[in-house]
Amino acid sequence: MATIADTESGRYVFVKGAPEAVEMLCDMNEEQKADYDKLLDYYRNKGMRTLSFARKRLEACENNTAEVLAAGKLKYIGTAIISDSIRPDIPETVMQCRKAGIKIKIVTGENGTTAREMARTAGVWQDTDCHENEITGEEFAKMSDEEALHIIPKIKIISRATPGDKQRFAQLQRKLGEVVAVTGNNVNDIPVFSFADVGICSGNAETAVKESAGAIIEEDSLFTILAAVRWGRTMYENMRRQMVFRYTANVTLFLTMLLAAIMCDTIPFTASQLLWIGLITDFIAVIALLTLPPSNRQLNKKPRKHTVYIITKDVIRNILLTSLPFTAILLVMLNIVEWLNHKPGILPVLQLKNLSMFFSVFVFLQFWNLLCVRAWGSKNFALHKFFKCRGMLAGMFLILLGQAVLVEFGGSAFRTFHLNFSVWLEMFFTTFLVYAVPEGTRAAMRRFRNKHPKGLITK
């Protein structure tokens, strides 16, 4: 940056900028240059930033800054040493990012020595890294896209980079299939945000930067970004869980209604009962699963690819392996209910009780399945830290309370009748097997993995 100013002692051009650029403009002998470079290296090796200043006296007719700088022969004024220390929590956060599969790349306008020392202090640059892991902006700009794509996976630092280098680097990373997040608080970072999957700035950034960014963090900390990643991955898993639960319940309901129409004379569910079932599957259970708190285990997983769909083979397999047995149980019970209700002399009250039991068994199956789905995709028990999940607790309580109220007081509107407390207990603990069997299977698999971490060993 250069500016012309009139002072009491005359007319001057003042220059500030990168020490290398200022050195080229100054009139220095070899000894002065050696001392200058030695001073810069001393502070850069400590991770400090440097900014040099120079000036030149002008004649009254000299007004073109570009011509003045081209002529050179400026007088060196001095160098500002700026200490921008790394926060104490940064190395630990960088280590957690590495475990989470997040690769941190530093693209900076600083000198290579300064950038490397800052990266080393932060934990980005390791002892095993070498010159293949860093490049200057000038070298990067000279490369073709094919050449750059070949070396980008190894690059950790781009020093003396321009905003254009940062933009191109983000574009090429995305070409490699990476999910790219760019951080920056400067106006020069605005164009880069549009070429990344998400642009991140801090709360103290300029208004224009905030408007362009996809995410704004109030605390200017890398840990905040890591926490956002944990929340994002948790929300993604929770979305998959609620889809597994909803589709399992809906497939079970569809198959039961369809096959019952073919095999039985009894209508499995009334319209009012279907409304309550829909409220459970599409609202209460969804809220319960989506409000599950974030787990630190999410930071031990690798990032998912762009090509991965929400509905995977695991999702489909879980839906089928759960809904088909549920359907079989319900159809067997419906046939038993129909057989009992067609016995000669059976009272209408008993018929309603049998149908109320069938209705309640369906709801209890979904109740226990909701608890199982909470543990789906994890290695934990379904009851692990269960009482910290307030949304899940509230949802399961509402299901039990709502079902009890509808059966006991629904009457003809819901085709239900009062059931004895012993009957409620029988249904509750009989359907408990829906939870116990998968939980026991997970426990056995967990025990097997602990004994054989590398799988089954055969001779």
What are these regions (language model features)?
Residues 408-425:
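Extracellular/periplasmic helix-loop-helix junctions in multi-pass membrane proteins
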Residues 122, 126-182, 186, 196-378:
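Membrane-embedded transport module
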Residues 329-335, 397-412:
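Hydrophobic alpha-helical transmembrane segments in multi-pass integral membrane proteins
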Residues 347-353, 386, 418-423:
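Interfacial loop-to-helix junctions that mark the boundaries of transmembrane helices
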Residues 1-34, 39-172, 176, 190, ...:
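Cytosolic catalytic headpieces and adjacent flexible linkers of membrane translocases
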Residues 366-370, 434-443:
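Alpha-helical transmembrane segments
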Residues 311, 315-316, 378-398:
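C-terminal membrane-solvent junction of multi-pass transporters and transport-like membrane proteins
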